Amino acid sequence: ARGICLRARGTAGRLHACYKLAQNVMEYSSGIATRTAEMSAAARAVNPAVHVAVTRKHFPGAKALSLKAALAGGASLHRLGLSDSILAFDQHRIFADDFIALIPKMAAAFPEKKIEAEAESPEEAMGYLRAGIDMVQCERFAPAELAAFVKEAKAEFPRAVIAAAGGINAANAAEYAATGVDVLVTSWVYFGKPEDIKMKFSRA
């Protein structure tokens, strides 16, 4: 779209001191928002209920801008930090003798927190659901494998939240959304070409 998105007035010296920073911030943020919007549109075209959720894997120091840009593009936030939910990856579970047994204990200890775990197979994911986990994140499942798992899991646990993660982007978002998952988890939107925003000086 063409049009003015930002206008500033000031002395020549002050304008030159800040315009390039403003232009760069807007270009990078707009790139994130555009990629997010494209991915969300592709996913919701086949599954209107699906959410695109962005991770914390943004460029260090750019959290606020990255997350606001993703929100502007129509995404939700997977997590803001380590304290807003419990998410167990393999690098956490390796230190537990019996992670399955920990799930009900975590639920009892933190009743206000959602408990989520990453799974690398349908069998592992189903085991977590049967132990009472709130959300399972299916890591790099093939679409056909994921669709079969979603059907089985929702039949037994209709309130469970199922997320797909690992390599999901605008090109394959529709295919993964069509499996019936609730959430597509991605960091793809952060990495790509900035938008091209032109700037022009004029004298008052």
Give the role of each language-model region.
Residues 142, 153-154, 169, 175-177:
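Catalytic-pocket segment enriched in acidic/His residues
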Residues 1-120, 124-131, 135, 147, ...:
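Acidic/glycine-rich phosphate/pyrophosphate-binding loops and surrounding catalytic core
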Residues 195-203:
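Structured adenosyl-cofactor binding patch, chiefly the S-adenosyl-L-methionine
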Residues 140, 166, 187-188:
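Short secondary-structure boundary segments
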Residues 155-161, 203-204:
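Short acidic, glycine/proline-enriched helix-loop-strand junctions
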